[in-house]
Amino acid sequence: MSTDRACMLCGLVQSTAEFNRNGCPNCQSIFEEAGVSAVECTSPSFEGLVGMCKPSRSWVARWMSIDSYIPGMYAVKIDGRLPIEVTELLPHYKPRDGSQVD
């Protein structure tokens, strides 16, 4: 059984231990402002992985809206919903669960 989880905001995939220890390197400041833990904003249920070495130069990263994030592995689709405390801070938030079509 995998212990990997995906951040429901940016899609970064890390182990549960990494999220517990360091939070999400892309989104931690938002989670802290909302008063929630990084693990509350992650999901063990996700589909597809994309490896990003240079997100700022990748068309796939632009398409996934992750071109300003750190290099790493990102989930394409993530099951779950962010806590309302987080979504209220983000007026342009688009869920990564496939429920919103562009």
Swiss-Prot record:
Sample GO molecular function, one term: RNA polymerase II complex binding
GO BP, sorted A to Z: mRNA processing; regulation of DNA-templated transcription; transcription elongation-coupled chromatin remodeling
Coiled-coil intervals: none
InterPro entries found in the cross-reference section: RPABC4/Spt4 (IPR029040), Spt4 (IPR009287), Spt4/RpoE2_Znf (IPR022800), Spt4_sf (IPR038510)
Subcellular location(s) per record: Nucleus; Chromosome, Centromere
GO cellular component: chromosome, centromeric region; DSIF complex
Described purpose of this protein according to its UniProt entry: The SPT4-SPT5 complex mediates both activation and inhibition of transcription elongation, and plays a role in pre-mRNA processing. This complex seems to be important for the stability of the RNA polymerase II elongation machinery on the chromatin template but not for the inherent ability of this machinery to translocate down the gene.
Protein name per the record: Transcription elongation factor SPT4
Organism annotation: Kluyveromyces lactis (strain ATCC 8585 / CBS 2359 / DSM 70799 / NBRC 1267 / NRRL Y-1140 / WM37) (Yeast)
Gene: SPT4
